[in-house]
């Protein structure tokens, strides 16, 4: 039974984007509901968010997929709401934010996270640190990891190596002051612009981004081989936890102690 947040405490709400087509993944079912250690990928993602401090989730789904997602999330540890996505990820996020703004309880939220359902194994400490950074005053927060591969910029028959010392790979969940990210998405919709992620949406309108440490565990499931790797990661985390009855998100919590962006210095909110 999902635990409801104290009515006097503004909830931390996660918009979980699960409306993608998954054309590169293929397979008989969408990757969001593909099995990962016996559970749907989206269910594992919501459990991981809950383990890190999210109180409720708004899952954005493709039209016609509501029943599949409701079944997949029937045992969610936190309350889950469903909203139909748009033609693009950007539209889907905006639909999720509008749902929160119009909901009698969720509209009290001041902190919102936006997460890709296909990053199911995000460790709890990453979620905690994103939330803590926002609650300590950051407007837009994203987890990042170092780029470890050599990157070449290719132009026809010529190429050059890109200095990777300042490059970072961006992950989710990204965290925001709800009023600001909502305003930015609405303005972007009016202008007809497009961005690659929600941090870019905030930066477009002059807001500063804050970075916290991400995790290699939080891989994005794009192709079938990614699911195989995620399966190995999840089983390894479960073995390390030695608690077969605990949620995957809780087991991943033990992988690394909680650390927030150094300049903010904040522990877990729970």
From Swiss-Prot:
Top-level class of the enzyme under EC nomenclature: transferase
Enzyme Commission number: 2.7.7.60
Gene Ontology biological-process annotations: isopentenyl diphosphate biosynthetic process, methylerythritol 4-phosphate pathway
Alphabetical UniProt keywords: Isoprene biosynthesis, Nucleotidyltransferase, Transferase
InterPro entries xref list: IspD, IspD/TarI, IspD/TarI_cytidylyltransf_bact, ISPD_synthase_CS, Nucleotide-diphossugar_trans
GO MF entries: 2-C-methyl-D-erythritol 4-phosphate cytidylyltransferase activity
Site (Transition state stabilizer) location in chain: 24, 31
Pathway assigned to this chain's UniProt record: Isoprenoid biosynthesis; isopentenyl diphosphate biosynthesis via DXP pathway; isopentenyl diphosphate from 1-deoxy-D-xylulose 5-phosphate: step 2/6
Known catalytic reactions: 2-C-methyl-D-erythritol 4-phosphate + CTP + H(+) = 4-CDP-2-C-methyl-D-erythritol + diphosphate
DNA-binding in keyword set: no
Site keyed Positions MEP for the nucleophilic attack: positions: 164, 220
SUPFAM superfamilies in alphabetical order: Nucleotide-diphospho-sugar transferases
Function, in words: Catalyzes the formation of 4-diphosphocytidyl-2-C-methyl-D-erythritol from CTP and 2-C-methyl-D-erythritol 4-phosphate (MEP).
Similarity section: Belongs to the IspD/TarI cytidylyltransferase family. IspD subfamily.
Official protein name in the record: 2-C-methyl-D-erythritol 4-phosphate cytidylyltransferase
Gene assigned in the entry: ispD
């Amino acid at each position: 039974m999902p635990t409801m947040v104290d009515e006097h405490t503004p909830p931390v709400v996660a918009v979980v984007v699960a409306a993608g087509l998954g054309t590169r993944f293929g397979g008989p079912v969408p990757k969001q509901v593909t099995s990962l250690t016996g559970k749907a990928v989206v269910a594992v993602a919501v459990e991981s968010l809950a383990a890190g401090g999210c109180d409720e989730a708004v899952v954005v789904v493709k039209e016609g997929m509501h029943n599949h997602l409701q079944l997949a999330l029937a045992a969610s540890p936190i309350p889950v709401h469903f909203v139909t996505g748009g033609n693009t990820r950007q539209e889907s996020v905006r639909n999720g934010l509008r749902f929160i703004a119009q909901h009698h309880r969720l509209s009290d939220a001041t902190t919102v996270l936006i997460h890709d359902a296909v990053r199911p194994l995000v460790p709890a400490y990453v979620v905690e640190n994103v939330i803590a950074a926002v609650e300590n005053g950051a407007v837009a927060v994203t987890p990042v990891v170092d780029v470890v591969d050599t990157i070449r910029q290719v132009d026809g028959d010529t190429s050059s190596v890109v200095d990777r010392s300042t490059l970072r790979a961006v992950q989710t969940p990204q965290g925001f002051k709800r009023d600001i990210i909502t305003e930015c998405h609405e303005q972007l919709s009016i202008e007809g612009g497009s961005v690659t992620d929600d941090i870019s949406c905030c930066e477009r309108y002059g807001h500063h981004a804050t970075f916290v440490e991400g995790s290699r565990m939080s891989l994005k499931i794009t192709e079938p081989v990614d699911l195989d790797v995620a399966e190995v990661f999840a089983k390894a985390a479960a073995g390390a936890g030695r608690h077969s009855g605990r949620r995957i998100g809780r087991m991943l919590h033990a992988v690394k102690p909680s650390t927030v962006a150094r300049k903010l210095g904040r522990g877990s909110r729970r």
